[in-house]
Amino acid sequence: MALLHSGRVLSGMAAAFHPGLAAAASARASSWWTHVEMGPPDPILGVTEAFKRDTNSKKMNLGVGAYRDDNGKPYVLPSVRKAEAQIAGKNLDKEYLPIGGLADFCKASAELALGENSEVLKSGRFVTVQTISGTGALRVGASFLQRFFKFSRDVFLPKPSWGNHTPIFRDAGMQLQGYRYYDPKTCGFDFSGALEDISKIPEQSVLLLHACAHNPTGVDPRPEQWKEMAAVVKKKNLFAFFDMAYQGFASGDGDKDAWAVRHFIEQGINVCLCQSYAKNMGLYGERVGAFTVVCKDAEEAKRVESQLKILIRPLYSNPPLNGARIAATILTSPDLRKQWLQEVKGMADRIISMRTQLVSNLKKEGSSHNWQHITDQIGMFCFTGLKPEQVERLTKEFSVYMTKDGRISVAGVTSGNVGYLAHAIHQVTK
């Protein structure tokens, strides 16, 4: 104790004789980060936190974009469990993957998206790299554009678009613009507005398109509308950047959900494409995705692949192994693939059924509003058309949680709570 005491005394004496030492000590005590402001909470995660604090036994969380079964529980696909068992039985190692990811997974992902008989695949004029789910695919794609797309820095997003699109492209150094997409008057697709805006986009700009199950609106163009949009994209020489996070999950048919991507390619439009297996395989936490660039020829594809690897190396070196093995096992095994496609259709059909039941229950409640847009929309999300003040009432009076824009995750609706939800919506809209 004496030594400690004498140390403090000597330290104090040194500071007294040398004021600079005291100033230095004070500077060390202060933080480097006093200028950092508190960031805003994530709007969707904020909904979940509020939901968790609610003690109402009838509470509903319709904010989170994750599939739930008809009991409201997280759902692990049986095909995923079988694939995991097969992988475990092989006693495989845990070595690093190559920078571009698991080769079998990349090949199978390209086939799933473009079709097994795609001319692009047969000619080898494409490159697919494994990414950290769809978000990682978008960031890799955005970084590639920033470095090599020399024609424009502008990326045109539909209004609205997935909330993460803006920070992903902005943080990669791209500039964000918008084009009309959703019509709040009809709760449907503003086709004439979208076509007019796209036709006015400067040539050689980047156009982001949701391949299916548009997030957050659930509003998709019809095939004939996609055809007209593709014609304008080709005429204006725009670069089509597709985000396909829900293949198979939208309609229950993977080929149907990939129709727009395949049509653009058939029209001679060389696209890039982001894929995610979070929703259609339920591999949320495994972070499994892919980024594909369709090129002029195989030689160009090799050059693009080399630069994608150079971009990926300082970002995360190489992607995760386990989820890619699961997805590749399912996609390359005929029996597992067949089972998986049936399970995906089952999930999609349940969501479609919940949309129908919600509208039916709203009619039973006596609602005089037209709710057809709920069944017209597709995929996990639905833009209800509810106003912010109505959303607030739903939360306060009925413990029904959703984002302020009125978007609900239909996956959170079950046969056990759809009647309660319809009653709550009717009460705040009548």
From Swiss-Prot:
**Catalytic reaction list:** L-aspartate + 2-oxoglutarate = oxaloacetate + L-glutamate; L-kynurenine + 2-oxoglutarate = kynurenate + L-glutamate + H2O
The record's PANTHER family line, in alphabetical order, gives: ASPARTATE AMINOTRANSFERASE (PTHR11879), ASPARTATE AMINOTRANSFERASE, MITOCHONDRIAL (PTHR11879:SF22)
Q: Kindly list the positions at which Phosphothreonine occurs in this protein.
A: 48
Q: How does it assemble?
A: Homodimer.
What's the top EC group for this one?
A: transferase
**Residues bearing the modification Asymmetric dimethylarginine:** 313
Looking up CDD domains in the UniProt record yields:
AAT_like
Q: Which InterPro entries match?
A: Aminotransferase_I/II_large (IPR004839), Asp_trans (IPR000796), NHTrfase_class1_PyrdxlP-BS (IPR004838), PyrdxlP-dep_Trfase (IPR015424), PyrdxlP-dep_Trfase_major (IPR015421), PyrdxlP-dep_Trfase_small (IPR015422)
Which interval of the chain is the signal sequence? none
User: Which residues are recorded as modified (N6-acetyllysine)?
Assistant: 59, 73, 82, 90, 107, 122, 159, 185, 234, 279, 296, 302, 309, 338, 345, 363-364, 387, 396, 404
Q: Which UniProt keywords apply?
A: Acetylation, Aminotransferase, Cell membrane, Lipid transport, Membrane, Methylation, Mitochondrion, Nitration, Phosphoprotein, Pyridoxal phosphate, Transferase, Transit peptide, Transport
**Its Enzyme Commission number?**
2.6.1.1, 2.6.1.7
Residue positions, PTM Phosphotyrosine? 96
**Positions where N6-(pyridoxal phosphate)lysine occurs in the chain:** 279
- Positions modified as N6-succinyllysine? 73, 90, 107, 122, 159, 185, 227, 296, 309, 338, 363, 396, 404
Q: Which organism is it from?
A: Rattus norvegicus
Describe the family membership recorded for this protein in Swiss-Prot or TrEMBL. Answer: Belongs to the class-I pyridoxal-phosphate-dependent aminotransferase family.
Which residues take part in binding substrate? Answer: 65, 162, 215, 407
Its function, per the record, reads:
Catalyzes the irreversible transamination of the L-tryptophan metabolite L-kynurenine to form kynurenic acid (KA). As a member of the malate-aspartate shuttle, it has a key role in the intracellular NAD(H) redox balance. Is important for metabolite exchange between mitochondria and cytosol, and for amino acid metabolism. Facilitates cellular uptake of long-chain free fatty acids.
Cofactor dependence is on: pyridoxal 5'-phosphate
Gene name? Got2
One GO term under biological process is:
dicarboxylic acid metabolic process
Q: Report what the protein is called.
A: Aspartate aminotransferase, mitochondrial
- Keyword Repressor belongs to the record: no
UniProt note on tissues of expression:
Expressed in all tissues tested: liver, pancreas, kidney, heart, spleen, arterioles, and lymphocytes.
Where are the Phosphoserine modifications?
143
Which compartment or compartments is the protein found in? Mitochondrion matrix; Cell membrane
